[in-house]
Amino acid sequence: MGLPANLYIDEEDKQTMIFAYPNLFTDASSLQVIRLEIGALAAWTPAELVDIVPYAAEQYPQLFKQKAVSVLTVSPERTFWEKATILHHEANRPEHLSMPQRYSRHYYDLYCMAKSPVKDKAFARLDLLQKVVNFKIKFYPRAWARYPEAVPATIKLLPPLYRLDTLQEDYTSMQNMLYGEIPSFKTMMETVEELEEEIHAL
């Protein structure tokens, strides 16, 4: 759009860089900025180089001299266990504490990974689950999250029943952020339940 980049440090979280990008419309279901969490409290191992092709380059290849860019990113096996421990955290959230907005994305992300080869790769790296748990206990301690119970035999992915209505509303409000074939809330949660059972059997 010919506008300068608007980059700044988040005042509430000094380890996060904010990129406020030009937009043609707003949507209450999504953040209107990109958050780059690049501080010391972000775990980067294991990591790998991945080629990313923007959607714009796929749709208008004639406009791009370079369609792909290599990005160093955390391996999907670690992301799988990061997401699983987020769900464990939410399963143990006290009833008087509200679940943050847009948290249904974590259930959707884990649903997608459970349907991909990432699941088996993550299952083969249970050491990463322990590393994620240790990291969160050290840097994000919350007694009620019960991180020591986030081991294969006792990890919890499903939220309490009283959270489901709110979670479903959140998921419905986020539909504009999702691409392709979008699973129903029921299908997504059934897959998460099956995944929890699979992990318990490891």
Region spans (language model):
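Structured mid-to-C-terminal alpha-helical surface segments
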Residues: M1-L202
